[in-house]
C-alpha cells in the first residue's frame, strides 16, 4: 500500500515540476502577436486557398499587418473584406475589381472532333502526356477530364458536355484551377469582361477548323 502512495506522490511531483517548467519556458519564449494581425485574421474568410499568393489566411494576415501585402489582397473576401481590413490598418483601400476564372476553349463534345472514345482515369495532367493528349483532335483545347473541378474549393467549375465551364457566381478567383490546368487554358479575368477569346489553338486556320467547328 505504501508503495502505491509513494508512486502517486512521485508522479504528482513530476507533473508539478513539468508544469512549472513549461510555464516558465512559455513565458520566456513567448512571441507577442501584433493585435492588428489578430484583427485582420478575424476578417479573412479562412478558406486558405492560396489565391492571394500566401500559404494561407494566417500568412496573409501577418503580411498585411507588417505592411507587406495590401488590404485588398484576399480575392475571396473581395471589396467588403478589403474595406474592413483597410479600416483596421488605417489605410484607404482602392476600388476592388471582381475577378473570375475563364476557360479559353469552347470546343465541347458537339463542336470538337473526337479521334477515339476514351475510357479510363479522369485526370488532365495524366492525359496530357499521352500521344495526342486525350481523345479530342485539338491538342490545345480543354480535355474535359476535370482536374480543375477537383482543385476548386468553391464548387465553381464543372465539366459540361466535355469542357470545363466556370460558374461566375460561385467563383472567387482563387487561381487553383489555373495552377492545375496542364494546357494553361484557364486565366483570371475581370468579372465584367465584355470580350473573351474562346480558342487557344496555335494551328493554322484550316487545321483548326477541321478539329473544331468553333476554332479560331
State where each predicted segment sits.
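Ferredoxin-type iron-sulfur electron-transfer modules and their immediate structural context
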Residues: 2-216
Amino acid at each position: 500500500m505504501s508503495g502505491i502512495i509513494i508512486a502517486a506522490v512521485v508522479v504528482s511531483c513530476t507533473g508539478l515540476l513539468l508544469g512549472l517548467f513549461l510555464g516558465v519556458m512559455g513565458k520566456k519564449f513567448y512571441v507577442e502577436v501584433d493585435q492588428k494581425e489578430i484583427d485582420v485574421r478575424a476578417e479573412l474568410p479562412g478558406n486558405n486557398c492560396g489565391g492571394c499568393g500566401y500559404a494561407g489566411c494566417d500568412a496573409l494576415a501577418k503580411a498585411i499587418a507588417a505592411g507587406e501585402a495590401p488590404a485588398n489582397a484576399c480575392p475571396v473576401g473581395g471589396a467588403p473584406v478589403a474595406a474592413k481590413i483597410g479600416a483596421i490598418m488605417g489605410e484607404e483601400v482602392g476600388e476592388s475589381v471582381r475577378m473570375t476564372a475563364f476557360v479559353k476553349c469552347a470546343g465541347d463534345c458537339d463542336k470538337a472532333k473526337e479521334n477515339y472514345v476514351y475510357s479510363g482515369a479522369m485526370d488532365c495532367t495524366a492525359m496530357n502526356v499521352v500521344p495526342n493528349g486525350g481523345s479530342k483532335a485539338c491538342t490545345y483545347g480543354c480535355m474535359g477530364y476535370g482536374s480543375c473541378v477537383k482543385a476548386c474549393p468553391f464548387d465553381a467549375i464543372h465539366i459540361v458536355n466535355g469542357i470545363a465551364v466556370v460558374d461566375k457566381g460561385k467563383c472567387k478567383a482563387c487561381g487553383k484551377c489555373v495552377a492545375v490546368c496542364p494546357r494553361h487554358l484557364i486565366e483570371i479575368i475581370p468579372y465584367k469582361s465584355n470580350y473573351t477569346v474562346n480558342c487557344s489553338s496555335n494551328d493554322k486556320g484550316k487545321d483548326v477548323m477541321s478539329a473544331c467547328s468553333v476554332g479560331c
